[in-house]
Every structure is written in structure tokens, then in C-alpha cells.
Amino acid sequence: MRKVLSFLLFLMLGLVASQLLPGALGTAYPGFKATADTLLYICLGFIMINVGREFEIDKSRWRSYTADYFIAMATAALPWLLIVLYYIFVLLPSDLWTDSAAWKENLLLSRFAAPTSAGILFTMLAALSLKNSWIYRKIQVLAIFDDLDTILLMIPLQILMIGLKWQMFAIVGVVVVLLIAGWRWQARWNVRQDWKRILGLSAVVCALTQALYIVTARWYGPENSIHIEVLLPAFVIGMLMKHREIDTPTERRAATGISFLFMLLVGMSMPLVTGASAAAAAAAATSITASQPMMPWGVLILHVVAVSALSNIGKLVPVFFYRDRKLSERLALSIGMFTRGEVGAGVIFIALGYSLGGPALIISVLTLVLNLILTGGFVVWVKKLALKSCTPEA
């Protein structure tokens, strides 16, 4: 719980800093922002490499994972689609309900609700002495597939934002090569896996993706550049590693510290939401979401509660499957999937790169904050249900 509360604290500190720093730094702010964004990408790459390291499947039994993958995909898709509909039909005026650009923007932004925080989840269940239970083993598979589905779907969403250009085929080609390499050589790379090496690999991945963008932007112009998000390349790097569990106090402190820095930087990346500067930015916005007028804080909070409820209702998909298990086990499995964290925050940051903003962005960030606040309640709920019906696995 201390880690969850720290996530919340650093995210909130970042949100406060995002409103104060532009005025405090003045003309130096753009340089500071560029440095902070670079650090954020490196932290996100570090997190995704570790998610990839956790992705361990027996390829000889790949058919047995099919049902789990489709359940995880549905568990990621339902909250996403519910929030897309909410953002379109509740937040936007009716004349934009059929606007294709509005749908594209909200399809990308709403994806923050899809991923489950695997790190928070596994730590939580292990601390409850449930590591040998069916719930733990099943949720481990679902949470990883959940994150994988989020990463993969970001590719067509990115293509949707770009439009039907030649870069789309280049991006698809890179994605196909990465997926084939990840599957073909999964867990084959026998490499040192301490936090320094993983952070270094993350920096290399970020440098390569940024270099590709800079070179193609110089050759073809920013509008025709190739921009590969760091999520999938970093995940595949983690997949290639022959997993080694390095559970030392130093490793735990380093990994936790990088996650805290990531949440702080995500908060700091938010645009101004109050004052004349925020109004001017909304008036000059190039996206539909960012051009929407800011709402009163009381109305925003009501939307945050509604979006949080929808995102968690959507995560109840596993209740309707695994009928050979008790209802309490299936409910515990679903509630465990309520936890959100770094990957969802990463999706919000990527959405910012496409100039998305406005009330929908603020609601998304505050929904993540509310979810972190409620994580303690989710822990207690899962504990009661799981210990009531815990079935150890052989």
C-alpha cells in the first residue's frame, strides 16, 4: 500500500508542478519540458522492458492460452469502449457526435482505461500469501495479456491518427518484424538484467525511436515522419531476455524509484488547465478534444466518478467466464483487474503527443488518481473474496 500511495503522491506533485512551472521558468520552460519528456520516455521504456520480461509462455502449449487472451482482450476492450462512448456522447456537443476526428482522438485517449497495473497486482496478491492460488496464476496471465493487447492496439490507433500515408506501411512493417522476433527468440537472450542494464537498454530504445523520427522529419518534414512509440520495442526487448529474478533491496529500490519518477513526470507533462494561458491554448488548439472549453471543477469531479465507475464495470468481464470456479473467485479475479498504474499513465502521455487535451484529458488523469486512491479498498475486497474461496494450485 505504501507504494500505491507514493504513486498517488508523485502523480499529484507532478500535476501541481505542471501548473506552476511554465510561469516560474518563463522562456526556459520549453527546454525543461523537452528534457522532462525524454526522461519520461526512458522511464516508460524501463517499465515496458520489465513487463516484457514477465511475459513467459510455453510456446508448445500456445493453444491453451487462446481463451485467456480473448478474455484479457475483452477485459481491456470493454472499459475502453464504454469510456469512448462517454467522452463522445456526454462530453462533446451533439454536432461533433459524427465527426471522425473526434472519434479518432477519443479512441486513443480512452485507451488509458484498458491496461491493468501488473506490478501493483502481483505485489498485492503475493503479500496476501496467494502466490500458489488459482486466482494469482490466472490473474498473472490475464494482466500480462491485458498489457500486451493495449500495446498492440496502440499501433492501429496511432495509424488512425496519422491517416493513410506511406508511413503507415513502414510502421506496420516494423511492428511485424518486432512481433516475429519476440515470438521466435522469446527468452533466448542471456543478458545481465540488473536495473542499470535495463535502464541503459531503455535509453538505447528511446534514442533509436527518436533518431528515426528526427531523420525522417528532416527528410520528409514533420508531417510525414515515422514515429514509433517506445511501448512495443521496449516490450519486445524484455520478451527476448531469458528471465532472471533479481530480488535484492537495491533492485527493488531502483525499480520503485524509476516508477515514482515516471508518475511525477507524467503529472508534469499535463497542459495548463486554468487561467488566461489555458484559455488561449484551447482557442489555438489543433485537436477537437483540446479545443473544448474547461468545465467547473465540480462538474469535472462528477465526470471523474462516472468514468471511474465505467472503467471498473468494464473490468468485470472475467466474472462471466471460468464457470468451473466459484463466483467469489471470479469476482476476486475481476476486482484485481481494477488496478491501474504506469501503462495507463503512459497511454495518456502518448495521447499528449498528438495534441489531445481539454476536459477529457483532465478527467482521464484524475480518474487514474481516483483509482490509485481506491486501490487500498480493492486490496481489502480481493483479500476477503480470495481467502474465502482460495484454492491452492498444485
Whereabouts are the PLM-identified features?
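Hydrophobic transmembrane alpha-helices of secondary-active transporters
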Residues: L13-L20, T35-R63, Q158, A207, ...
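Membrane-interface alpha-helices at helix entry/exit sites of multi-pass transporters
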Residues: K131-F145, L152, W166-A170, P249-T250, ...
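Structural signature of hydrophobic alpha-helical transmembrane segments
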Residues: K33-M48, A101-S117, K165-V177, E223-V236, ...
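N-terminal membrane topogenic signal
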Residues: M1-L9, R192-R197
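Small-residue-rich segments of transmembrane alpha-helices in multi-pass membrane proteins
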Residues: F10-A17, F70-V84, V141-M154, R197-Y213, ...
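Membrane-interface helix termini and inter-helical loops of multi-pass transporters
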Residues: P22-A34, L91-S100, I159-Q167, V215-I226, ...
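Transmembrane alpha-helices that form the ion-translocation and gating core
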Residues: R61-L130, L264, S269-K388
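Core mid-bundle transmembrane helix pairs that form the ion/substrate translocation pathway
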Residues: I144, L148-I151, I155-L261, E393-A394
